[in-house]
């Protein structure tokens, strides 16, 4: 609705909550209607419109590139990242798809997390440099370098309260 302008988005959200305006009118709250937002709302189901934009069902079997997903337990959008992981393995059991997941929010997973989230004091072990790990990942796939050390197995998760990482 507001592009990358986070402050504008916050202001629009608060105004929407305060006024009770219908959700499909939220893009007009600040006088700047958004044709993309309206187009998306006109497709509330996972119909052909959305299916053309993302892998769907058997499409996952054709994904034959290494994939690294970094996600967080507190990420309100994590269901999409984990959906792609599950579907990739479902249709391509030999996929080279790795997951790093820990106590991170939506943005925290890509910004090294934070020492506290929703009142929970995050374990020191969980505060990893995800940007550096991403660079290491690219070196691994493009330059034949070693795989990032944290990727012990395909699924790598931080055990909250135990100050440790585990892998499956």
Features from the language model and the residues they span:
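Accessory cap/linker subdomain of secreted extracellular hydrolases
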Residues: 1-61
């Amino acid at each position: 609705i507001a592009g990358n302008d986070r402050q504008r988005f916050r202001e629009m959200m608060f105004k929407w909550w305060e006024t009770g305006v219908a959700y499909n009118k939220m893009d007009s709250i600040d006088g700047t209607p958004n044709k993309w937002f309206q187009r998306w709302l006109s497709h509330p189901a996972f119909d052909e419109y959305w299916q053309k934009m993302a892998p769907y069902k058997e499409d996952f079997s054709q994904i034959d590139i290494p994939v690294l997903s970094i996600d967080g337990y507190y990420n309100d959008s994590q269901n999409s990242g984990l959906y792609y992981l599950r579907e990739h393995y479902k249709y391509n059991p030999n996929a080279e798809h790795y997951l790093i997941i820990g106590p991170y929010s939506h943005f925290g997973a890509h910004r090294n997390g934070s020492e506290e989230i929703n009142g929970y004091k995050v374990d020191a072990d969980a505060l990893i440099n995800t940007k550096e790990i991403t660079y290491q990942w690219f070196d691994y796939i493009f330059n034949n370098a070693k795989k990032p050390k944290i990727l012990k197995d395909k699924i790598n998760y931080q055990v909250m309260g135990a100050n440790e990482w585990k892998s499956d």
